[in-house]
Amino acid sequence: MNSAYTAIESDVPEQAQQPSAQSNATSAGANVSPSEWTWSQKLKESSHPIALLFYIFFRVSPLFIYLFGTLLIGIITKKNKFILHFIIIVLLVSGDFWNLKNIAGRLLVGLRWWNEVSVIKSTNGEFENVWVFETVDPNRYINPIDSKVFWTLLYVQPAAWVVLGFLALLKFEFLYLLLIIISISLSLTNAMAFTKCDKFGKANHLATDIFSRATGNLFSRLNPFST
């Protein structure tokens, strides 16, 4: 399996990329550290509050519905509770996968990935999977609140599904175990892909920076007019 890498142009104007210290101090209070902010204050400091809210919703709601969905559905109807419960969780897990892969990753941390199938030229019609990674310009401001929430929930959710899967196995709930396996596979796919995308982006930016510095020093030494 191969990997490709490209850069994303910033979709945030330069003037709006990095909030001023004065606005941060005003909204959070002069004597309150960021660690003591309330959730509403942290949400106000987010660069993409709507995207952050949807990200939290899709990450948490499948787990919440798995734990309490039967009770909530039982209030509405007594028929086919398991089928409705199963379908709702599948829809939420699918929505979480799509939102994380296509929207939340790009807006919150400037990362995006997808998988392509290409034909190997040296073989007779054989195919290979290629992971394509995109990352934003390193000069773009990444909000620390958005980044912290993104990476925390990216790894916490699959860990929670693993715990629930172990409990389902102990209870011999094999249909729910099948649902959990699907959820874990989708969640781990995103976690692995974004981790690789982040590493590829950092390595590419580091290599570009080293190359630009090396060529800059070389040209400055060869320049007869340099002092």
From Swiss-Prot:
Glycosylation (residues): N24
Localization terms from the record: Golgi apparatus membrane
Record InterPro entries: TVP23-like (IPR008564)
Domain of life: Eukaryota
Compositional bias segments (type: Polar residues): 15-32
GO CC annotations, alphabetized: Golgi membrane
GO biological process: protein secretion; vesicle-mediated transport
Pfam families hit by this protein: DUF846
Main location: Golgi
Transmembrane domains' residue ranges: 56-76, 83-103, 149-168, 172-194
Membrane association type: Multi-pass membrane protein
Assigned keywords, A-Z: Glycoprotein, Golgi apparatus, Membrane, Transmembrane, Transmembrane helix
Region (Disordered): 8-32
Function: Golgi membrane protein involved in vesicular trafficking.
Entry's family note: Belongs to the TVP23 family.
Protein name per the record: Golgi apparatus membrane protein TVP23
Organism for this UniProt entry: Debaryomyces hansenii (strain ATCC 36239 / CBS 767 / BCRC 21394 / JCM 1990 / NBRC 0083 / IGC 2968) (Yeast)
